[in-house]
Amino acid sequence: MKTLEKLSFPKLENEFLENILRQLVNQHTVIQMFFTRQPSFVFSYLIIHIEKNIDAQELQQNKWVKKVRKRYQIDVYFIYSERLHHRFSLGHPFIEFYCQPSAIIYQNKELENPLIVKRDWKKYKKRFNMFEDHFHHDHDLHLSQVQNLISEGSSNSVFTSYARLIEYDLEYLEELYSGNRSASLNLDERITNLIEYIPDIQKYFVRNSHSKYYLIDLFVKAKEASINDDEAIYKNEMYEAVGIAEQSLYRLIEERFDELKTLIKKGLFEKHDVVCQIDDKPEDVIL
């Protein structure tokens, strides 16, 4: 058992969260923690590298995770070891930037397989380009399908295909801003969540209620019409509105790629001295 009172995380500047993390380290197999403080108007990131997937899923649902996010603007993300290393191997830019050694605030030396990012931009560039190219390749395939359906005059199918393309865009925005996608949520919920990271999204999706968006409602109705083989009820000019929304999401993804690329290249993490101390616990490296 670890002596909880001897473990501290002064870099967090948050006593409430420190107390939770002490308990977390004592009760679960925590391999590492990474923390990046951001300006007050955007989320700071606390990434907790944990051994097992089942623990990561369970801990992510804890009420304190939402509380810390809402009250302190700290986004807590639990990720299990196999997934973290896999995403690192793919060149995932979120992982590359927010899991730099200078962001480590806790590391258990007794546990195997910590993530240590040692490569510089020159070594990482190829991975980054492959990751970004994969997005563009699949995006172009989705868009080509939409354009083919438009040329065929298949109105309802156009909107259901646009829905898949916009879902694809939202997945990448989630990955690039939070490190994880929210596949269990519907499109309305995913847009609402992303607004907290990217307020500009509100410009492209008009609400028709507190938690619903006009374009998403359009997609639902088009899907129902396709299933029931109903006549097309949408005018061609509606394609333009949907197309503008999709192009705007695409632009936001490109901007985020460029932002992460710049941050990684410049190495904008500060060089930290020791930010956590733990007495008489050599197995827990606090950096």
What are these regions (language model features)?
Residues 29-32, 155-156:
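Short N-terminal helix-loop-first-beta-strand/juxtamembrane motif that initiates sensory/input modules
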Residues 1-27, 35-91, 96:
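Metal-dependent nucleotidyltransferase catalytic core
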Residues 137-140, 163-167, 243, 247-250:
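Generic structural signal for well-ordered, non-transmembrane alpha-helical segments
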Residues 174-287:
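Long, charged low-complexity segments
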